[in-house]
Amino acid sequence: MAFNIESLLEKKSNPVEEGNDFEEENDSEKNGEEDEEEEEKNVIDGWTNMATSQLAMFAIANDLRTPTLVELQMLLGVSARKHDYKRSRKSVCERKPRQAYSARQLDRLETEFQTDKYLSVNKRIQLSQTLNLTETQIKTWFQNRRTKWKKQLTSSIRQMVKDAPTSTSVGVPFQSLLTPPTPPTTLACHVNSLFACEQ
């Protein structure tokens, strides 16, 4: 039996009216349909495997990147799964209020941060006892301070690069920092010539 839309939409007759002939015919049709479905599945799997391997070979041959999940979904006509759940988050009333640090606490924390960006467990325990804060509060303060420090560092580097053609860094033109280092033999000769000039 051919698989098409009409066969699906046809109203099937009642098997009781047809009798045993229908059951025998139905069994043979089922076996035939199962064989056809299995054959179609094998053909589809074969095409899918071939298309996948050809796509991969094309990508390798042309030095292309692997497609992203979204690109594959668009290519295959599969929509992205929509999630109906939301991340659970503590309500505002359940959350602890922000820690208000005293000037003395902030000064000490800043001093420790300038000394070392990462605290040891012993140092954290000592600070918590000295400043009357919990270890978690100190740990969180240091994490936040490191984040701020990294942002400031990135910003200053960007500014330095932006101003590079006109400024110098420690007496060395910025452009020379971008050039490859001088080979050791030339550098040694240069250093020797400098010492020779001083004598």
From Swiss-Prot:
Region of interest: Disordered: 1-42
Matches recorded under InterPro entries: HD, HD_metazoa, Homeobox_CS, Homeobox_TF, Homeodomain-like_sf
The keyword Transmembrane helix appears for this protein: no
SUPFAM superfamilies assigned to the protein according to its UniProt record, in alphabetical order: Homeodomain-like (SSF46689)
Keywords of this entry: Developmental protein, DNA-binding, Homeobox, Nucleus
SMART domains hit by this protein: HOX (SM00389)
UniProt GO molecular function: DNA binding; DNA-binding transcription factor activity, RNA polymerase II-specific
Biased composition (Acidic residues): 18-40
Protein name, entry field: Homeobox protein ceh-19
Species per Swiss-Prot/TrEMBL record: Caenorhabditis elegans
Originating gene: ceh-19
